[in-house]
């Protein structure tokens, strides 16, 4: 089941990124607020608006400064309602260093919004894991940021995020986005 979910997510990622409205690459410096572990997280995101809905995929790889790696894939679908995007989806986490039986799947729900402020675009959101297995780590992530266009299709961004519940982290990031 997990391999089927991962394969479905990767197929969706390939199809979405090929026909995407945007692709982005972000890098965050992350600090665990419990054990002080530091990592660098890289995100590839792609999204498509169609038929009044939006579909997004996120692939995240975190490399820890003292060794170790985490990978996850999330696929979400959402709808804008009064300027707020409500979304839900599914994720797959490969576990620390791909440890045998360390991987798990989860659902997720969230809200995000953004607004232009002069030449900039501000954004914020919140998402939380909906675990169907109580042994899996709980996590709620909040984020906010600002994006600045460089050209009509290219923008750079800076963001802050905070994770709460079982996973407690703070992150500062920068990104590059190309819109089509």
Where are each of the predicted segments found?
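Outer-membrane beta-barrel proteins
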Residues: 2-180
């Amino acid at each position: 089941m997990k391999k089927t979910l991962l394969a479905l997510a990767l197929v969706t990622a390939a199809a979405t990124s090929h026909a995407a409205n945007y692709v982005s690459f972000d890098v965050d410096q992350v600090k665990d607020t419990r054990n002080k572990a530091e990592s660098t997280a890289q995100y590839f995101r792609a999204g498509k608006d169609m038929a009044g809905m939006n579909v997004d995929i996120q692939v995240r790889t975190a490399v820890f400064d003292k060794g170790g790696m985490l990978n996850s894939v999330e696929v979400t679908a959402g709808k804008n309602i009064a300027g707020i995007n409500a979304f839900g989806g599914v994720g797959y986490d490969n576990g620390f260093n791909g440890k045998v039986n360390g991987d798990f799947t989860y659902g997720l729900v969230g809200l995000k919004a953004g607004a232009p402020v002069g030449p900039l675009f501000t954004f914020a959101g919140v998402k939380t894991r909906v675990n169907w297995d109580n042994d899996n780590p709980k996590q709620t992530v909040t984020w906010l940021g600002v994006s600045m266009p460089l050209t009509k299709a290219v923008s750079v961004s800076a963001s802050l995020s905070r994770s709460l519940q079982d996973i407690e982290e703070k992150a500062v990031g920068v990104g590059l986005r190309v819109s089509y």
